[in-house]
C-alpha cells in the first residue's frame, strides 16, 4: 500500500490539474520527452488545466528545462529527477495517461517497454511509439495507442482521442486486464 506521505506528494504535484499525463523513464533522446512537451503546449487550449509529470533524469535534462521555460510551461510541466518508489507509484496511480512515444535515436529503439506494462497494471492507457517493442506492451485501440513519436500531430491526436472520450476509461480497464498476462505466474506457465 502507498503511504500517506507519497500520496500527499502526488497530490501536491498534481494539485487540481486535469488531465494528468505521466512519463517514467530516463531523460534520453529516444524517449521523446521534447516532443511530449511540445505536444503539451498544443494541448493547453483544449485542456488548460493539464499537467504533465516526467519522473527520471538523464542527458536531456538541460535541454528539457530550457524547452519548458521557452514555451512558458512551468505550471504545466514538472520534471522530477529523484523520487521514492512510493512517490512514483502514487503519481502513476493518480495520473490519467502514460505517455512515452519513443523514437529511433542514435540507431537505438525502445526494447520491450516494461514501463507501459507497469502503467497498465495501474489501469492507465498508454501512448507509445511505433519503432520498438511498444507494440508488444500496448495493444493499439484496446489498451492505448501507438504513433510515430516524431509526429507531434499524431501524439496530439492520440492524446485528444483518449482524453476527450469516456471510452478512455475502458482503455485503462483493458490495460489492467492485459497487464495480468505479464505476471510472473503467467510468464512461468508460458
Regions found by a protein language model. Give the residues of each.
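Conserved donor-binding/catalytic core segment of Leloir-type glycosyltransferases
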Residues: 13-31, 37-40, 53
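A short, well-ordered alpha-helix in the C-terminal region of glycosyltransferases
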Residues: 44, 154, 167-181
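Short acidic alpha-helix that forms the nucleotide-activated donor recognition element
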Residues: 62, 84-95, 121, 139
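Nucleotide-activated donor-binding/catalytic signature segment of Leloir-type glycosyltransferases, i.e.
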Residues: 62-86, 97
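Acidic donor-binding loop of glycosyltransferase active sites
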Residues: 93-108, 124
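Short hydrophobic beta-strand element within catalytic cores of glycosyltransferases
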Residues: 116, 121, 125-128, 138
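Conserved acidic donor-binding segment of nucleotide-sugar-dependent glycosyltransferases
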Residues: 139-141, 145-152, 161-166
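C-terminal alpha-helical cap of glycosyltransferases
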Residues: 184-190
Amino acid at each position: 500500500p502507498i503511504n500517506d506521505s507519497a500520496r500527499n506528494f502526488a497530490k501536491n504535484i498534481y494539485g487540481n490539474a486535469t488531465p494528468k499525463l505521466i512519463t517514467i523513464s530516463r531523460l534520453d533522446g529516444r524517449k521523446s520527452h521534447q516532443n511530449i512537451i511540445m505536444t503539451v503546449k498544443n494541448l493547453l487550449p483544449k485542456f488548460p488545466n493539464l499537467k504533465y509529470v516526467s519522473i527520471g533524469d538523464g542527458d536531456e535534462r538541460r535541454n528539457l528545462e530550457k524547452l519548458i521555460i521557452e514555451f512558458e510551461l512551468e505550471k504545466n510541466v514538472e520534471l522530477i529527477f529523484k523520487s521514492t518508489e512510493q512517490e512514483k507509484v502514487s503519481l502513476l496511480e493518480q495520473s490519467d495517461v502514460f505517455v512515452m512515444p519513443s523514437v529511433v535515436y542514435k540507431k537505438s529503439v525502445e526494447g520491450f517497454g516494461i514501463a507501459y506494462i507497469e502503467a497498465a497494471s495501474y489501469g492507465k492507457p498508454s501512448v507509445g511509439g511505433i519503432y520498438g517493442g511498444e507494440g508488444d506492451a500496448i495493444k493499439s485501440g484496446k489498451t492505448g495507442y501507438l504513433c510515430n513519436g516524431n509526429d507531434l500531430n499524431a501524439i496530439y491526436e492520440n492524446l485528444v482521442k483518449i482524453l476527450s472520450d469516456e471510452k478512455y476509461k475502458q482503455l485503462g480497464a483493458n490495460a489492467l486486464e492485459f497487464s495480468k498476462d505479464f505476471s510472473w505466474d503467467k510468464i512461468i506457465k508460458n
